[in-house]
Amino acid sequence: MLGIPEQEDRSDWYKFMEPLLRDEESKSMFKMPAQYMFKDIPETGSHDDFIQYTIEQMDKFHINQAMIGFHEKSDVKIQAAKNHSDRFFFDLPVNPNIENEAENIKRHYETFGIKAVSAFPSGMYPQIAINDPKWHPIYEMCVELDLPFFCCVGVPGPRIPMAPQKVELVDEVCWYFPELKFVMRHGAEPWTALACKLMLKYPNLYYSTSAFSPKHYPQDIINFANTRGINKIMYAGYFPMGLSLDKIFAEMDSVPFKDEVWPKFLGENAQKLLKL
């Protein structure tokens, strides 16, 4: 997970969440809604070419490819897809509150070649729980197109209700849609032990480490990767939303993964899942 900034002020990235924010810090003081957790929001500065700037940041840390949230109204995303398909591939953020969202997935798949679908159940307004039937057309389309579904689970960072993202809700989705490739993102805390138990239970359930610096990777996830979950856990960053690549990779070597876990964690698991 990575973003291509389009300007130094990225507050517009979070406008979709404004109807849910009630405290004054979140509404008017934070650069991003979970800033109380992220003390050093990356400063990207101003650049004539933010795509090239992002590629340079990737090259510093030998990142060959990155998954970007796609928006067809963004000229930067369109140009990245057109001119740098070797470096960027795309997920489509979706919202069941939008009419015909499942067909929108198909259109983006056919037109832009998206590789995945993503969602933030607690962040949409109205909120929609992971197991709500309103998601079913989207899940069905993901199965039809064989697109992985990346979903925020666990307590959300922003000060908004957590109920739609309780990890226990994933159980029903994986039971009802056994062919759906479901990837938990943004922590699954405090239910990481349950997340691991569900990954043992369901062959198409995975976990990515998005929005967490390596020193805060949950111990349950590290233990699972080192044992029965070697093919289930995959790296994801959070640049430039909340973490710099410098911070992420300065801490990475301290993660106690076994030697055989590293290549799968850093690339092989994602490459297989996303058919890269």
Which residues does each predicted region cover?
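Mid-to-C-terminal alpha-helical segments outside catalytic/metal-binding sites
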Residues: 3-60, 65, 229-234, 242-276
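Conserved, mostly hydrophobic/aromatic
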Residues: 58, 108, 142, 186, ...
